[in-house]
Amino acid sequence: MDGLTTEYNYYSNFDYAINDEKIIVNFLEEGEEEPYLEEILKTPFDWTEFDIPPVTETFSESEYKWLDRIRGGEGKKVEFKSTLRYHIHLKKADKTIEHEIAKTISAFLNSYGGLLIVGVDDDNNILGLENDFCLYSKNQEDNFFKAFRNIIKNYFGLGIVAKLNYDIVSVFGKKIFFIDVYESTKPIFVNNYGIKEFYVRVATTSSLYDVEEAVNYVIERWKN
């Protein structure tokens, strides 16, 4: 009896609708001579209508792994870029943004590889690819991939494609673009409108080396 009474009082305190569920009974406590009235539930209360609805949106293990990578921030082998081509302040495609992509890839190639993620800002916030997608009226993903391949072709030539693994993935409802860059077995230069540039990853930045620095680095890096 104590259990049902406790249950009744508990539900009453939380304002559950139990008026139709209660019943008044005569209850004789052991050792007492006179019974007393007690309100209890006729049956154990059904919690079903108060259950929290199940979460219908689920996320894959892969998404959590990507989130962990992003939360880890930038480093010697990880770089984030907000966009592939879109200049957030100018609100249009801009060559300086493309050049930033190219120099990061070059630095990873000339060092020990790395991961470039587009659609994430410097504060590890996932922005998605909508700014880049808005540059195209249709076939947005296809045109995005085409734009990336053109960046590779224009700044490097297609010879480095074998050193890149890239794709678009979804992370908690937002799309990001990753480029997994493998280290190169030879020096790779960025062709910046006829000017050859040599980049190396130093800490969390892609550093431009002058001629003397580049020569010394190449000799040391690929001396075997």
Task: Identify the function of each model-found stretch.
Residues 1-224:
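Conserved N-terminal catalytic/coupling substructures associated with nucleotide/phosphate chemistry
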